Amino acid sequence: LVGSEMCIRDRVGMECAYAPFNWTQDTDTTPDGSKAVKIAGSDYYAYGYDVAVAQKLADQMGMDLEVHKVEWSSIGISLDAGDYDCIIAGMGKTKEREASYAFTEPYYYRNNCIVVKKGGKYSNVKGLSDLADTGCKVTTQLGTGWIPLLDQIKGAEQSGNFETTSECFLAISNGSADVCVIDVPTAESAALTNDDLQIIELDENDTFTGDDEMVNVCIATRKDDTALRDKIQDAMNAIGWNDKAKMDELMDQVLTQQPAAN
């Protein structure tokens, strides 16, 4: 959406490595016949919840979807540089991010959880207090709103955070971390192909506080590009993408479509 391209291309940035929100695959086909989207400048394709939503919105706006793959650590920098025009990447709308970007209303609502090793020392945890003073090694993804939550696990050892969620889950599998704080869909996606993982949704009366921001997953544009933000929001409204039942149905669908490698 740059200059004369405004009505032609919907240029979207995403990690393409954050299943089930977005991932990279070899072909444009999925098991249910949905079409993955070619990654700009690549021989690979992207699919997942973010891609499916982006395609719906591009269709509504009469635009061609163009997916740009970018490292999570530089996803905002590349938006500001003009490499693409919006971020649809499982991004939570936080107060800190709102200072830098314009956001739509949520296109997904997610719950947070912890992931531990199945059958391990922490597999019977029910609430946050069960982890207190155990000296558990905690981790999450870099550059996310989950990092501040780690400090709420009393006496935990900060074992280091990772660029991708895949690395977080590998740390749980190999024992270099005991607890990963993450969202439920991402954990469910990983558990489909990693039998070492156990997902625990903490008791609502014994869980993290101040994590509400990470529940709202929104589309970001550059701070001054409110016209594009509003155009995307209008498209969301037009297709009724404020219905949590629709969101959950699509998420359930894409969870079954990811290649085993993701």
Q: Model-predicted segments: where are they?
A:
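Extracytoplasmic small-molecule ligand-binding "clamshell" domains
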Residues: 5, 9-90, 99
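A ligand-binding cleft/hinge motif common to bilobed small-molecule-binding domains
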Residues: 73-77, 90-100, 147-152, 173, ...
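Periplasmic-binding protein-like
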Residues: 108-119, 193-236, 255-262
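Ligand-binding clefts/hinges and TM-proximal coupling segments of bilobed small-molecule sensing domains
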Residues: 4, 9, 145-162, 199-201, ...
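Acidic, polar ligand-binding/catalytic clefts
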Residues: 55, 59, 64-130, 204-212
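Short, well-ordered beta-strand segments
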Residues: 11-13, 137-140, 180, 220
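Bilobed "Venus flytrap"/periplasmic-binding protein-like clamshell domains
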Residues: 16-19, 43-60, 91, 110-169, ...
